[in-house]
A protein has these predicted regions:
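Sequence signature of WD/YWTD-type beta-propeller architectures
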Residues: 18-201
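Bacterial Sec-dependent N-terminal signal peptides
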Residues: 1-24
Length: 201
């Protein structure tokens, strides 16, 4: 067997072993302070993993209970679900409700928060979302991009970048009849104009 492959196997096992395990757990009544707040929501069955974090945690264990099985992840302050296991788990629980149990090590004490629910919709979500990436406030646009995100994983690609146009401001883009085959956006400033993107056969 390849030595590099073996090294990575032992590394992953070692990292998993380093994650603190809950002991002397105290149940609390306040909601789990997870970020982003994914508590009690409905999700499409093809959505990318809902990874989250608890700021200030020194250990974290999350168990998602489905209809017949469960999915467990642990770490320091982040819950990151393996995408392959996540996708197959959601497929098995399509149209059903899942319970999420969060236990976190805060200030030297393990705290068990009340469980919350993820309802898995029987419907899929459209695979892609496009958006304008700009600094908060909209007063400046030194770094401005139009980007496309695959909602079934974390793949992203740049549609347009104002670094390639002399730093011009780019207006929000729109699609014709919600079709990815036809879109447009306006470029302001010197040499500005409306950019039309049309897929041709």
């Amino acid at each position: 067997m390849n030595k590099t492959y073996l090294f990575f196997i032992f590394l992953l096992v070692g990292l998993a072993a380093c994650a603190p395990r809950p002991e002397n757990v105290t149940s609390v009544t306040e909601s789990a302070p997870i970020y982003p707040d994914y508590t009690d929501i409905t999700i499409p069955y093809n959505i990318a993993p809902l990874n989250f974090m608890i700021e200030g945690a020194d250990g974290l264990q999350v168990t998602v209970y489905g209809d017949t099985d469960s999915l467990l992840v642990s770490g320091k302050d982040k819950a990151c679900f393996p995408i392959g296991k996540w996708k197959s788990f959601l497929l098995r629980n399509k149209g059903k409700s899942m319970q999420v149990h969060v236990t976190a090590l805060i200030s030297g004490k393990w705290l068990a928060y009340p469980s919350f629910q993820w309802q898995v919709a029987a419907d899929a979500i459209d695979g892609y979302l496009s958006y304008r990436l700009i600094e908060p406030g909209y007063e400046v646009w030194n770094d401005l991009q139009l980007r496309e995100r695959n909602l079934e994983n974390f793949d992203e690609k740049v549609i347009a970048d104002n670094k390639l146009t002399g730093g011009n401001c780019m207006n929000c883009h729109t699609y014709g009849k919600q079709s990815g085959q036809l879109s447009m956006f306006h470029l302001r400033g010197e040499k500005g104009g409306t950019i039309l993107n049309r897929k041709t056969t």
